[in-house]
A protein has these predicted regions:
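Active-site and donor-binding regions of nucleotide-sugar-utilizing enzymes
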Residues: 2-158
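Conserved donor-binding/catalytic core segment of Leloir-type glycosyltransferases
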Residues: 160-166
Length: 166
């Protein structure tokens, strides 16, 4: 299977996309990690074979909806995991945030919408109340990178951060 991993902000997303890509490649998949402009260019030129397009959000903009439709029409599957999870928001603010980040239409365009945890899972299921089976709690590979197995990759911090951060 061809897997296309969309990176918007490399500093924030590249390590986790590399983790996903390495795991997928080790299982026999072909993986391309790229920004959206190069993926769009490859699609226009007809050089990308159908596969899974995994994006960093399904914000319901006209451009994104049309791009996902072109992918689907060319037999791609669209999946997403929102990179900006809104973890520190109150329930009401998280609901508002996710309503801006997803819509019934963009959820329905997606073969799978992956969630960080129970809060975003429930809110996204409420947005797309007719078909909830494509909304799945998986956690985030960004958080997986915090595990002790990756300590050699990151190294030990010289000092403890002053405030919580992601």
């Amino acid at each position: 299977m061809n897997i296309y991993l969309h990176v918007e902000v490399a500093l924030r997303e590249l390590d986790s996309k590399l983790l996903l890509g390495v795991i997928a490649a080790s299982r026999g998949h072909q993986v391309l990690i790229s920004d959206i402009s190069e993926i769009e260019r490859g699609l226009r030129r007809g050089i990308l074979n159908p596969g899974i397009f995994h994006t960093k959000s399904i914000t319901p903009s006209e451009h994104k909806i049309n791009f996902h439709k072109r992918l689907i029409d060319k037999k791609f599957l669209v999946t997403s995991l929102d990179e900006e999870a809104g973890l520190e928001l109150s329930d009401e603010k998280l609901r508002e945030y996710l309503n801006d980040r997803a819509s019934k239409k963009t959820i329905r365009q997606s073969s799978a919408v992956f969630c960080w945890g129970d809060d975003d899972l429930q809110i996204l299921k409420n947005i797309n109340f007719k078909n909830r089976s494509n909304i799945i709690k998986t956690g985030s590979p960004r958080v997986d990178l915090w595990k002790s197995i990756f300590l050699n990759y990151w190294g030990r911090p010289n000092k403890k951060p002053k405030k919580p951060f992601l």
